[in-house]
Amino acid sequence: ISIEKTTGEVFIATENGLVSFISGGTSTQGDLSKVYAYPNPVRPEYDVLGYSNLNNINKGVKLKGLTDNVNIKITDVVGNLVGEAQSNVNYRSSSKNFAIDGGTAIWNGKNLSNNIVATGVYLFLISDLSTFETKTIKVLIVR
C-alpha cells in the first residue's frame, strides 16, 4: 500500500495487479507554512456548499498542508464560532460539518446550527497542538 502525498491517491498492489482510489486525505506536513484553502473565493457556480456527506471529496471547502495534531476553528469576521474540528477526533465519517483527514480538512459550508453560511469572509484559525504554531486563513464565500 502506498499513498501519493499531494493528491491522497491510495495505491494497493495485489497478486492480480494494481488498484488505486482517491481518498481525499493527504499526508500531514511538518509545519503550517504551506497551508492553503480552496476553492477561494467560493463562488455559487462551484456548487460545493451545503452537502451533508463529507465523503464526497469534490464538494466542500478544503484546507491542505495541515500538521498531524491541529485544532481548527472557523469564525466569521465578527468572531462568531461557525465550526470547529480537531485531528484524530472529527473524521469525515463522523457526520459533522467540518472534519480533518490527515493533512486535509473539509468544511461543507454549514454553521453549528446546520445552516449554510451567508456571503462573507470566514477565518480558519489553525493551531498546532504539539508545537503551538498558529496560522489564519481567510476564505471568501459568495452566495
Language model features: what each stretch is:
Residues I3-T7:
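Residue-level detector of Asp-centered blade-edge/turn motifs that repeat once per structural unit
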Residues E9-I12:
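Conserved beta-propeller blade signature
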Residues F21-D31:
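Short loop/turn segments immediately following beta-strands, especially the blade-tip
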Residues D31-K73, S130:
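Glycine-centered coil/turn sites that cap beta-strands in beta-rich domains
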Residues V70-V82, Y122:
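Short, glycine-anchored, charge-dense loop/turn motifs used at functional sites
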Residues V78-V117, D128-T131:
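Glycine-centered tight-turn motifs at strand-turn-strand junctions
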